C-alpha cells in the first residue's frame, strides 16, 4: 500500500470481519490518519505462482478423485512445493497415469469456471469439499477434472498452470502424501534434475 505522501506500507495480513476487508500493515506512520486514501499493488509474480500451484492442485486432486476415489484430506502451498494428502493409497503407476491425465487437462487450456449456485442448485450438485458452509458457496469447475467448493485464487484457464509434476510420494495415514510443483516451479525442478 502506498500513502499519498509516497510512504509505503507492507501488508502482513488480510482478513474479513463483518463484511469489511481489513489489511494489517507492518507499521503505520503518523501521516496515515483514519480515512486516508491509499493505493494498493499486488505482487503479481507471487500471486501468479500461487494461482498456478492452487489450480494445479485442483486439477490433480480432481483426477485422483475420478481415477481412484481419492479424497484430498489436506494440502498446503509451501514456498518450495505443494503438499497434498489423499485418503487412499495410490501405486506409483497410478500416480504416473494421474500425472499424465492432469497435464492433458492443462494442455487442453480449458477455462476455469467460477459460479455461485443457489442453495437449491447446490443441493443437486456433485462436488468435492461438500461441507456445511454458511452463506454463499463459490464453486470452481475445471471441465474434465474437478468441481469443488473453494474460495482461493485460480488461473483463468488451465494452460496458465504450465505443467504439473509430482516430485515425491510417501505412504501417509492410510493414504499418500504427495509433493507437487506446477508452472515455473515445475520447469525449475526439471532443470535441477538435469544438473
State each model region's role.
Residues 1-195:
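Active-/binding-site microenvironments in catalytic and ligand-binding cores
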Amino acid at each position: 500500500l502506498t500513502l499519498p505522501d509516497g510512504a509505503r506500507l507492507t501488508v502482513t495480513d488480510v482478513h474479513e470481519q463483518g463484511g469489511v476487508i481489513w489489511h494489517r500493515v507492518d507499521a503505520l506512520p503518523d501521516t496515515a490518519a483514519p480515512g486516508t486514501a491509499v493505493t494498493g499493488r499486488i505482487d503479481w509474480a507471487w500471486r501468479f505462482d500461487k494461482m498456478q500451484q492452487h489450480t494445479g492442485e485442483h486439477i490433480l486432486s480432481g483426477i485422483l478423485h475420478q481415477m481412484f476415489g481419492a479424497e484430498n484430506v489436506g494440502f498446503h502451498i509451501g514456498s518450495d512445493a505443494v503438499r497434498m494428502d489423499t485418503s487412499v493409497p495410490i501405486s506409483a503407476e497410478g500416480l504416473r497415469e494421474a500425472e499424465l491425465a492432469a497435464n492433458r487437462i492443462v494442455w487442453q487450456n480449458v477455462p476455469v469456471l467460477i459460479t455461485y449456485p443457489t442453495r437449491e442448485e447446490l443441493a443437486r450438485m456433485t462436488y468435492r469439499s461438500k461441507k456445511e458452509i454458511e452463506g454463499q458457496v463459490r464453486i470452481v469447475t475445471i471441465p474434465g477434472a474437478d468441481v469443488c467448493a473453494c474460495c482461493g485464487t485460480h488461473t483463468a484457464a488451465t494452460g496458465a498452470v504450465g505443467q504439473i509434476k509430482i516430485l515425491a510420494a510417501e505412504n501417509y495415514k492410510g493414504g499418500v502424501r504427495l509433493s507437487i510443483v506446477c508452472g515455473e516451479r515445475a520447469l525449475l525442478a526439471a532443470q535441477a534434475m538435469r544438473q
